[in-house]
Amino acid sequence: MTNSKTVRLRVMQGDTIAFGPGKAALLQAIDRTGSISGAAREMEMSYRRAWLLVEEMNRCFNQPLVETATGGASITALARDVVACYQRMQKKADSAIEKDMLHLQSLIVGKD
């Protein structure tokens, strides 16, 4: 859907968002830039916020999604699988709710 009103999936672990669109974007940015700081700059967020999100993701999954080393960071094979799975889930959800979303959007004040 190209409309600005949309539904975004979030995978919860208790009260914690284990994974969602922001964390997917952060992993992709780390993959592109090779570092958490580079990803944070690209996403216009603080390094501290990016680091906390990485720590949270690494705690929520049975294996780390991001590995750090002197001079940078990289995403793991598990992270690539998680991002791909999340994107498939989001695409299926968008498709499943498309008709109802269009109807709901027609009722929302200030629609685009």
Task: Map each language-model feature to its residues.
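Alpha-helical linker/hinge and terminal dimerization helices associated
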Residues: 86-104
